[in-house]
Amino acid sequence: MSAVRPIDHFLHLAGAEVALAAPGPTRSAGLRATELLAVTPKPVRRPSPQRLAVCEHLGTACAEMRPDLAAAFEALEPELAWRTRSIPNASPGFAEGHASARVLGPDGLEQRGGLVAGFSLVAPGITYPEHDHPPEEIYLVLSGGEWWQAGGVWHAPGPCGIVHHPPGIRHAMRGTSVPLLAIWFLLPSRSGSRE
């Protein structure tokens, strides 16, 4: 019997949490993500693993996580290629205070049914600026941090909280006294093809 791959173990745990999302559109998005996680993986050309200075906050983030998710993340993390990006009008320190690592989709570790997924890490005191995008998005919050969505107020869902962003809605997130770590899932359009 072969050992369970770290990516499969983490995504199994994350998928189970996302499937438990609240009723309504959030639950529908969570169930779609879970269905796509079950699609047979297709290999891709994996990026070389890479850590950035902001990754020093991962230990603190893992201490905030549920123990089984923390252990699964710690097993997967050495395979990840952490990257940063510049965003116009971002707050000072943003470039050094955040990173993301793609898990599924282009530049990820593999492909599954058109689902694009990755981790976001935001250092304490740093805000990931307001933005929007066409794909519907659902987050599984792994550590602390706060979230905002157009028409709402900043809130802290806490570890294992679910955050849902309908297509095109403005949203942002920020580290508080602790770093924010979450896995996000960008859902393909319903008319999109399954890979």
Listing of model-derived features with the role each one plays in the protein:
Residues 2-6:
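Intrinsically disordered, low-complexity terminal regions of plant proteins
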Residues 128-131, 148-149, 165, 170-176:
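Short beta-strand His + acidic residue motifs that chelate non-heme Fe in jelly-roll/DSBH
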Residues 123-126, 133-151:
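Glycine- and acidic-residue-biased ligand/ion/polar-headgroup-sensing regions
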Residues 99-106, 115-133, 167-168:
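Conserved short histidine dyad/triad with adjacent acidic residue
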Residues 121, 132, 140, 159, ...:
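Conserved strand-loop elements at the edges of beta-sheets that form or border functional pockets
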Residues 8-113:
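A short, N-terminal "cap"/entry segment at the start of jelly-roll beta-barrel domains
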Residues 138, 151-170:
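Short acidic-glycine-tyrosine-enriched beta hairpin
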Residues 168-190:
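Ligand-binding loop in jelly-roll beta-barrel domains
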